[in-house]
């Protein structure tokens, strides 16, 4: 399927060709001047549309991850990661009810185990995960995501997650984590963290 950028799509919807324009109050801009008849033939300044945050494709793990690592190792990883989160600057995101927190961790472990090819425990209990929607009540910024991933590296190392499937698991959570950002704090795109940049830490 052909993909369009936002500016191209808007131009096609309006059915007008855009040109660079100059406005006495704004100077020369990268905005586009559209001849819109409903404005009496006057040219209007239109700032081009652009994507604020582009989500990369998310490749889920194959069932090889569950076969090699084992469901219990995946669950151990999720629990260790959340133990680190609970004792990190991200703890306020989860509230003060530690009992509720660990109950939610069990559901998260179900989801990760199922996503990696394990039993469908999560969908049997909760149905579709709707991850982005479920995270909307919490403020998650770019730097929160980066710390979340840093702690994942530490958790992978601490539980000795099998290196032969660590990259497959990492590429899933690294890309997926971008979709959890719901409060922009910079115009720069989220930092990508390829597996090759963290692999050496897992061998320590």
Predicted regions, residues:
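Core of compact, soluble alpha-helical bundle domains
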Residues: 2-204
């Amino acid at each position: 399927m052909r993909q369009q950028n936002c500016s191209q799509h808007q131009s096609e919807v309006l059915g007008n060709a855009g040109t660079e324009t100059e406005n006495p109050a704004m100077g020369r801009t990268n905005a586009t001047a559209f001849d819109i008849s409903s404005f009496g033939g006057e040219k209007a300044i239109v700032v081009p549309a652009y994507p604020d945050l582009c989500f990369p494709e998310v490749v889920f793990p194959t069932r090889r991850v569950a076969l090699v690592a084992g469901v219990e190792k995946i669950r151990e990883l999720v629990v260790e990661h959340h133990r680190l989160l609970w004792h990190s600057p991200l703890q306020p995101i989860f509230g003060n009810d530690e009992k509720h927190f660990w109950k939610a961790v069990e559901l998260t472990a179900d989801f990760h185990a199922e996503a990696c090819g394990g039993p469908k425990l999560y969908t049997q209990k909760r149905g579709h995960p709707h991850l982005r929607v479920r995270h909307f009540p919490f403020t998650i910024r770019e730097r929160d995501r980066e710390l979340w991933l840093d702690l994942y590296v530490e958790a992978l190392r601490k539980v000795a997650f099998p290196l032969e499937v660590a990259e497959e698991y990492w590429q899933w959570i690294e890309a997926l984590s971008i979709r959890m950002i719901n409060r922009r704090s910079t115009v720069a795109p989220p930092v990508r963290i390829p597996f090759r940049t963290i692999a050496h830490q897992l061998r320590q």
